[in-house]
């Protein structure tokens, strides 16, 4: 599919904005009508009172009409709000296509971990990050899932399943729009961790033995209440009851209060715990139910999506029906605040019986809550990748090679840069090619960007997304990067020490199952040239011996000798600049060999420093 998404988004945004204008005009008209009803109602009542012919109908009819229009107005406002969400969905999509997306979406800062081997170095989270570019998820579970995929490489089998799912979802724009609109309600109101924990928590009430006890107590309490009523109405002569009968009814009434009251207060602590927990959980499930109901209606073809769709079902029953049952239980629980039910509470065991119903719901459906959340989160994450695929139809899915520790790319570019600014390079590293590229070059020539380009496309590839390349073939890789490091005054860590700690972390990665792709910028920049040369060669040699592949950049041309020392396992490449009419120009193309010039002095002169 190579259709340009821009006209599609533009057309749909126009439709949503037109619908908003139409519905806002209708809402304004409803406001005028409500005002007219109030004015006319007051006038009619005043006239009726003045004429002495007042009837409750004169006031009742305007009140009923006003209330009906209020309800209609609230429903219309909800529709308008959802249309606005849809419009924002397409506005953000167009902003991504125009390269103006940074700062408009969710940055994923809560996932940022300075100890992660590549998250900060490759701009995974934060303003202008990969997460902000990709994420269209509107629930926390969807964001959590997408972040986990970016932070943890999947196996080729899992990646291929995701690729198939993304390819199917990329054409389902209506589904992606609906999930973005419906998920907004669930965004701030649903905590997936606590909700799943509530569903799986041990039972606070024993459904088995309590059920018959509660029904016996309800029957006994009902009989006691009826007996008490009979005693009461006998006292005013409305029923003919013997003294013995009255005494028995009175005793039954008192005993039912004592017995039911004993059990009611004996069970009060676990019952209050059940009711307190379910109030929040039921609210969260209610917010999530529309998202789940929308997914229930969709029919999927690929195995991954079909399996997720099936996982929503529990014994053939969709989550919307199960959540609806819990909603009905909650409505009955909430009605205990009714004055009449407060009087009857102890007699009919209203709260205990419905607390038990909640526990029975949890025993049948509680363990499914995590499955619902997982399925919804995965589909939202897949929809995020599908939106990216839809918006970049020329970006292919990568292929996985059985060759260990290799990456081969044709026209590889940085996905966070606007398409008109991306400069692409070819590269083959690992396998039968050199395992280490020593990248030299002048300042601002593109060395660090090349490292990030390699890393971020590897992350996309192993998450299941398309990559910014004409073609990319790679083996499964564990990425370790040392690009963006800083000192810490509070932690007592210098930049150099922070770098060697990260290098230790990268070296430790080589003990895992996957071969390592290391990306090291300005190798050992915080020490003298002699120590840097010795340390760098030893570390690179150790990485290669452990099957690692990667790139290191440097300004120190002495480090270029590392490639010669490693023979066929390493090679030198460089980026360079051109100076024309006193201006420094970069083409950002990677070339073989060692750079032969520096631009530091020219850069200092360009900002007005006297050199």
Question: How should these model regions be labeled?
Answer:
Residues 1-444, 449-478, 502:
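Alpha-helical coupling/stalk and coiled-coil linker elements that connect catalytic or binding modules
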Residues 260-263, 385, 392, 396-611:
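ATPase nucleotide-binding head domains, primarily ABC-like/P-loop NTPase cores
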């Amino acid at each position: 599919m190579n259709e340009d998404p821009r006209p599609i988004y533009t057309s749909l945004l126009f439709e949503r904005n037109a619908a908003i204008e139409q519905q806002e005009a209708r809402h304004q008209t409803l406001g005028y009508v409500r005002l007219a009803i109030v004015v006319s109602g007051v006038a009619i009542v005043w006239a009726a009172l003045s004429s002495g012919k007042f009837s409750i109908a004169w006031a009742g009819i305007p009140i009923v009409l006003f209330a009906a229009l209020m309800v209609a107005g609230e429903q219309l406002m909800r529709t308008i709000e959802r249309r606005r969400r849809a419009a924002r969905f397409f506005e953000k999509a167009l902003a991504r296509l125009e390269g103006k997306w940074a700062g408009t979406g969710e940055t994923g800062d809560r996932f940022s971990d300075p100890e992660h081997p590549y998250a900060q170095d490759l701009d995974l989270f934060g303003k202008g990050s990969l997460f902000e570019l990709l994420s269209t998820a509107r629930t926390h579970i969807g964001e959590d899932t997408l972040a986990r995929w970016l932070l943890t490489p999947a196996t080729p089998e899992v990646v291929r399943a995701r690729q198939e799912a993304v390819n199917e979802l990329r054409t389902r724009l209506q589904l992606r729009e609906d999930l973005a609109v419906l998920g907004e309600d669930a965004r701030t109101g649903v905590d997936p961790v606590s909700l799943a924990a509530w569903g799986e928590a041990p039972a606070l009430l024993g459904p088995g033995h309590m059920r018959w006890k509660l029904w016996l107590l309800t029957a006994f309490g009902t009989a006691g209440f009826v007996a008490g009523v009979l005693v009461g109405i006998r006292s005013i002569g409305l029923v003919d009851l013997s003294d013995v009968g009255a005494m028995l009814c009175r005793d039954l009434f008192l005993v039912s209060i004592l017995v039911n009251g004993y059990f009611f207060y004996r069970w009060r602590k676990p019952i209050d715990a059940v009711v307190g927990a379910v109030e929040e959980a039921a609210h969260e499930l209610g917010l999530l139910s529309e998202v789940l109901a929308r997914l229930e209606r969709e029919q999927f073809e690929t195995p991954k999506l079909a399996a997720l769709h099936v996982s929503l079902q529990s014994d053939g029953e969709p989550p919307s029906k199960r959540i609806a049952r819990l909603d009905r239980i909650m409505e009955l629980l909430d009605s205990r605040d009714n004055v009449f039910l407060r009087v009857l509470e102890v007699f009919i065991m209203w709260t205990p019986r419905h607390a038990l119903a909640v526990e029975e719901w949890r025993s049948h459906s509680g363990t499914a809550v995590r499955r619902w959340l997982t399925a919804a989160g995965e589909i939202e994450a897949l929809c995020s990748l599908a939106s990216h695929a839809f918006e970049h139809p020329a970006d292919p899915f990568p292929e996985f090679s059985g060759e260990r520790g290799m990456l081969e790319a044709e026209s590889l570019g940085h996905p966070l840069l606007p398409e008109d600014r991306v400069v692409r390079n070819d590269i083959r590293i690992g396998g039968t090619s050199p395992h280490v590229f020593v990248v030299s070059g002048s300042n601002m020539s593109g060395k660090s960007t090349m490292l990030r380009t390699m890393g971020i496309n590897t992350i996309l590839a192993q998450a299941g997304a398309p990559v910014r390349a004409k073609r990319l073939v790679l083996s499964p890789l564990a990425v370790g990067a040392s690009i963006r490091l800083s000192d810490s005054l509070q932690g007592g860590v210098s930049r150099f020490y922070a770098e060697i700690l990260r290098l230790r972390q990268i070296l430790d990665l080589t003990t895992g199952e996957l071969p390592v792709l290391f990306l090291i910028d300005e190798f050992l920049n915080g020490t003298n040239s002699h120590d840097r040369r010795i340390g760098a060669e030893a570390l690179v040699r150790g990485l290669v011996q452990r099957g690692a592949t990667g790139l290191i950049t440097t300004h120190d041309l002495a480090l270029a000798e590392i490639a010669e020392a490693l023979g066929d396992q390493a090679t030198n490449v460089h980026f360079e600049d051109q100076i024309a009419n006193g201006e420094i120009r970069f083409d950002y193309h990677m070339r073989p060999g060692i750079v032969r010039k520096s631009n530091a002095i020219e850069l200092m002169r360009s900002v007005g420093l006297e050199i």
